A protein has these predicted regions:
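Interdomain signal-transducing alpha-helical coiled-coil linkers
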Residues: 1-9, 18, 22
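Catalytic NTP-binding/metal-coordinating core of nucleotidyl cyclase/transferase enzymes
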Residues: 6, 10-14, 26-110
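Alpha-helical scaffold within the catalytic cores of cyclic-nucleotide enzymes
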Residues: 66-84, 100-136, 140, 160-173, ...
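Alpha-helix/helix-capping structural signal
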Residues: 23, 50, 142-143, 182
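A conserved hydrophobic position in a structured secondary element of the catalytic/binding core
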Residues: 20, 47, 179
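Cytosolic regulatory/linker segments at or just downstream of nucleotide-handling modules
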Residues: 143-145, 171-219
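Short, surface-exposed loop/helix-turn segments at secondary-structure junctions
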Residues: 148-159
């Protein structure tokens, strides 16, 4: 009986760590069943593939999933390299965060380096034999994070900062990193100097109005 219980516990831990961030899985395994955290400053990342719907029309379902899996595996590898937490993928979109659930003081710097590596890798990637272009949006601000679901757990983020990052992505330029002034200020503070960027002036963001934004320059 004890062996069965131990095996079940091992399987439960394996399942949770595959679904949730390590820190969150550990808390749930210790009996914490309502996880809701708040962090005042994190960096949130969104990206998507430009014209993906048209690209997908020329792929079989098997080829489409195979290509997406290969492509997002690059993201996952780079996220691990830079200490970025993947939140989810939705179709061709990728959402990630730095600064929660593990608090770090250099979340903007980590995210900037991650985004630059993503742009470089994406330029070299071919989807169904064709090169792709992506948009990236990044914002720094406060979020609420937690686990929802009874049988199928999901770790997610909520807050205005999430919406802003998403809007920055959708209004971005091809193969560029579209950032908010809040992210630029956080990055400048963490670098000790202002990074190279190009002002986009005031960008109209849906449900937010005009916001000063920038394109972060590649190294």
């Amino acid at each position: 009986m004890h062996q069965i219980e131990r095996a079940a516990a091992v399987e439960q831990k394996k399942l949770l760590t595959n679904l949730l961030p390590h820190e969150i899985a550990e808390r749930m395994l210790k009996g914490e069943n309502r996880i809701a955290d708040e962090e005042e400053s994190v960096s949130i990342f969104f990206s998507d593939i430009i014209g993906f719907t048209a690209i997908a029309k020329h792929c079989s379902p098997v080829d489409l999933l195979s290509e997406l899996d290969e492509y997002f595996s690059i993201y996952d590898t780079l996220a691990l390299k830079h200490g970025i937490e993947k939140i989810k993928t939705i179709g061709d979109a990728y959402m990630a965060v730095c600064g929660i659930p593990k608090k770090v003081d250099d979340h903007a710097l980590r995210m900037a380096n991650f985004a630059k590596d993503i742009v470089k890798a994406s330029k070299e990637f071919t989807f169904n034999g064709k090169h792709i272009e992506i948009r990236i949006g990044i914002h720094s601000g406060p979020v609420i994070a937690g686990v929802i679901g009874l049988q199928k757990f999901a770790y997610d983020l909520w807050g205005d900062a999430v919406n802003i990052a998403s809007r920055l992505e959708s209004t971005g330029k091809p193969n560029s990193i579209h950032i908010s002034n809040d992210f630029l200020e956080s990055l400048t503070k963490q670098m000790g100097e202002q990074p190279a960027s190009v002002s986009m002036g005031e960008t109209m963001l849906k449900n937010r109005g005009a916001m000063q934004t920038y394109l972060l320059q590649m190294d």
